[in-house]
Amino acid sequence: MPPRPRFDRRAPVRELPNINDRINYPKLRVVDADGTQLGVINREEALDVAKDRELDLVLVSEKADPPVCRIMDYGKFKFEQEKKAKEAKKKSHQTEVKEVKMRYKIDQHDYNVRIGQAVRFLKAGDKVKCTVIFRGREIQHTALAETLLRRMAKDLEEQAEIQQAPKREGRNMIMFLTPRKTPLIKTDKENQIPTRAVRTITAPPRATAAAKTQLNKDQ
């Protein structure tokens, strides 16, 4: 029986970018950092130009004849490429429906946990299906379940909008929330700063000259 292959615990070898001394072609077509064509020059000269500009010589088209290199800040270029890749991945995110389950008699701690789960799903761009599960005779308390779901929608109003209002589905009551596209602007009176009444104290009238003269005679 042949020996079983050993599990290779080593990290996979990453392919290193073709920049600077890792470029092994003797002749290169070089494009300067500002887009100027420097023409076909030998490798050593191209490296010297990049070094004088304190930049990198990067191979951008290996299949061309001769291969094409560009002088650039490779660190900045790599950062911008990774940023673009993340943005493209974010835009291509497929919306999923995540479910949050609970009972209508849920305690405050468990309710807070469900709220936290829903917030994470919504921030990831997914819809949330909120489900209240009934068991046995609990089906009689659909009104309490609806109240719970509407409370949940209220607590999540900054992150979500109601896509489907609470409704009974079999032995469950469900509600669908979708990520809010526009920020919520609160206009209720609770967010307004109350204006306190200020008591105005009227200063006493100033004494006239005649009154002052009479007062001096009396004294």
Swiss-Prot record:
Keywords, comma-separated and alphabetical: Cytoplasm, Initiation factor, Protein biosynthesis
Its domain of life reads Bacteria
Q: What is its main location?
A: cytoplasm
Q: Which Pfam families match?
A: IF3_C, IF3_N
GO biological process: one example:
ribosome disassembly
The record ties this protein, via InterPro entries, to: T_IF-3_C_sf (IPR036788), T_IF-3_N_sf (IPR036787), Translation_initiation_fac3_CS (IPR019813), Translation_initiation_fac_3 (IPR001288), Translation_initiation_fac_3_C (IPR019815), Translation_initiation_fac_3_N (IPR019814)
| Signal peptide (UniProt feature, chain positions) | none
* Assigned GO CC terms: cytosol; membrane
Q: Name the Gene3D superfamilies for this protein.
A: Translation initiation factor 3 (IF-3), C-terminal domain, Translation initiation factor 3 (IF-3), N-terminal domain
State if Protein biosynthesis is listed as a keyword: yes
Any one Gene Ontology molecular-function term assigned to this protein's record: translation initiation factor activity
Q: Where in the cell is it found?
A: Cytoplasm
Tell me its family: Belongs to the IF-3 family.
Assembly, in brief, is: Monomer.
Among HAMAP family, the record links this protein to: IF_3 (MF_00080)
Q: Which NCBIfam families match?
A: infC
Function text: IF-3 binds to the 30S ribosomal subunit and shifts the equilibrium between 70S ribosomes and their 50S and 30S subunits in favor of the free subunits, thus enhancing the availability of 30S subunits on which protein synthesis initiation begins.
Protein name per UniProt: Translation initiation factor IF-3
Taxonomic source organism: Prochlorococcus marinus (strain MIT 9313)
